[in-house]
């Protein structure tokens, strides 16, 4: 079982279906594909959004799997 990491969405391109996450307390960016986003309806992320995810090693570097948006970060 992988542990979940947290980070902030750097950018996400809806037309291309991918973007990058800045991991919390780590250097480098993590690739995120729309197919790994765990949510109902249209799967998308927004820049600045907090997410939790699992990190996997892929052929082109690290990528996020099982991306879950963190709700209610600053509900004030």
From Swiss-Prot:
SUPFAM superfamilies: Nucleic acid-binding proteins (SSF50249)
Molecular function terms from GO: DNA binding; nucleic acid binding
A single GO BP: regulation of DNA-templated transcription
Signal peptide positions on this chain: none
Keyword Transcription regulation carried by entry: yes
InterPro entries reported in the protein's UniProt record: Cold_shock_CspA (IPR012156), CSD (IPR011129), CSD_CS (IPR019844), CSP_DNA-bd (IPR002059), CspD (IPR012751), NA-bd_OB-fold (IPR012340)
Keywords: Activator, Cytoplasm, DNA-binding, Transcription, Transcription regulation
Localization, UniProt: Cytoplasm
Alphabetized Pfam families for the sequence: CSD
Disulfide bridge partners, by residue number: none
Annotated GO CC locations: cytosol
Superkingdom of origin: Bacteria
Major localisation: cytoplasm
Boundaries of every CSD domain copy: 7-67
Keyword Transcription regulation assigned: yes
NCBIfam families listed in its UniProt record: cspD
PANTHER family linked to this entry: COLD SHOCK DOMAIN PROTEIN 2, COLD SHOCK PROTEIN 2-LIKE
Protein name: Cold shock-like protein CspD
Natural source organism: Vibrio cholerae serotype O1 (strain ATCC 39315 / El Tor Inaba N16961)
């Amino acid at each position: 079982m992988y542990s979940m990491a947290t980070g902030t969405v750097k950018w996400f391109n809806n037309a291309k279906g991918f973007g990058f996450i800045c991991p919390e307390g780590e250097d480098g960016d993590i690739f995120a594909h729309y197919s790994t986003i765990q949510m109902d309806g249209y799967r998308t992320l927004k820049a600045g959004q907090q997410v939790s995810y699992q990190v996997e090693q892929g052929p082109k570097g690290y990528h996020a799997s099982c991306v879950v948006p963190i709700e209610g970060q600053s509900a004030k």
